[in-house]
Design a protein with these regions (language model features):
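A short alpha-helical cap/connector motif
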Residues: 1-97, 101-222
Length: 222
């Protein structure tokens, strides 16, 4: 395969994703989102061909002619068409990669629909979770992508906080970012709830007032 070795997206994939999967034996991999470039598909398929695995790629656009390999099954469907997709998948998967609709509600839906298929100690990776490159005056500078990725980032933190005994969560900020969830348990995930933080508590207000006056006193004494 002729994989393009340029770009931060590839660097992110090689450094944050690939080390988790490169030595999997006979891996069963589910990928949501192919795209015209098909970079992740090419890398994952190369792995499956070398390690006697199977790659299941799902996309609403027809990329079925992109590759010709006995190790690849293309599923021409929406990623949330679970009833159909599930009939083509094995009972358990070694890796899931999501790169389709980058909105918090959709990411949560796909995670909850397919997470139970993942083997324990295996990974579910979600691409595009950093809003920073899309902020004003940054290289991508895009309002909707900034907001979508911001909401997705914090939604994943809420999901983790509600399920911290069932998963680990890591983030990469290379390129447009990615989240890596490691499954720790076969227990069913529960829906996220608000985090009971104390940012807006009366105690924190007193802390801020105290810090403000301490700073004023220090400046006055200087």
């Amino acid at each position: 395969m002729n994989i393009n070795t340029n770009g931060r997206h590839l660097t992110k994939f090689k450094e944050f994703v690939y080390p988790e999967i490169y030595d999997l034996k006979s891996p069963k991999i589910l990928e949501f989102g192919v795209s015209a470039a098909a970079m992740s598909t090419e890398i994952l398929l190369d792995l499956c061909e070398r390690n006697n695995g199977k790659l299941y790629s799902v996309d609403i656009n027809d990329f079925s002619s992109k590759f010709n390999s006995k190790n690849w099954i293309f599923i021409h469907r929406r990623d949330d068409d679970y009833n159909f997709i599930n009939t083509l998948l094995p009972s358990k998967l070694d890796f899931i990669y999501l790169d389709t609709i980058h909105k918090a509600d959709h990411v949560e839906k796909i995670l909850f629909k397919y997470f139970h298929l993942l083997k324990v100690n295996c990974n579910f990776v979600i691409d595009d979770t950093s809003w920073l490159p899309y902020t004003k005056n940054r290289e991508k500078n895009h309002f909707f992508m900034e907001v979508n990725n911001y909401e997705t980032f914090f939604r994943l933190i809420k999901i983790y906080n509600s399920n911290f005994e069932k998963m680990n969560l890591e983030f990469s900020f290379l390129g447009t970012g990615a989240a890596k969830i490691t499954k720790l348990s076969e227990k069913e995930l529960i829906k996220p709830c608000e985090i009971n933080n104390r940012f807006y508590s009366f105690k924190n207000l007193l802390r801020l007032i105290y810090d403000f006056f301490i700073l004023k006193i220090k400046k006055f004494n200087d």
